[in-house]
């Protein structure tokens, strides 16, 4: 039998589709998933910046290229992350041209690690 998500129902399980919600239901109320990070674009930004070694920064155009996002969309999500204290933007000049470099703040790194840990515990429930 096929369910809406395209997965096969295991043999002998007539209530398979309801089981994930039952298993996760109790655990989900105990797990805090940060809504600032959880949005897809911001999660991709955080994951990319988390891969940058502490003390290093990523140039805005490189992040935009890696994530295949428009400059406006990336800027909007970076502003939200910066407002939460998760990302810092270092605006400077390279010659006469403005340049923006990005990095996770220490709080942002901790928040991302907590997010990953909480998501894993939710998925493992």
Segment roles from a protein language model:
Residues 1-30, 47-50, 110-125:
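Amphipathic alpha-helical dimerization/coiled-coil segments
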Residues 60-92, 96-97:
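Canonical helix-turn-helix DNA-binding module
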Residues 94-113:
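Basic, amphipathic "hinge/linker" alpha-helix immediately C-terminal to the N-terminal HTH DNA-binding motif
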């Amino acid at each position: 039998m096929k369910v809406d998500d395209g997965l096969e129902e295991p043999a002998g399980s007539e209530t398979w589709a309801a089981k994930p919600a039952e298993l996760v239901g109790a655990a989900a109320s105990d797990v805090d998933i940060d809504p600032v990070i959880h949005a897809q674009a911001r999660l991709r930004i955080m994951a990319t910046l988390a891969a940058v070694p502490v003390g290093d920064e990523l140039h805005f155009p490189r992040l935009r290229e890696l994530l295949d996002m428009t400059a406006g969309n990336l800027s909007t999500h970076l502003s939200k992350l910066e407002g939460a204290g998760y990302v810092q933007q270092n605006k400077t000049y390279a010659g006469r041209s403005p340049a923006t470099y990005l990095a996770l703040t220490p709080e942002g790194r901790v928040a991302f690690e907590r997010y990953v840990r909480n998501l894993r515990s939710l998925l493992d429930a």
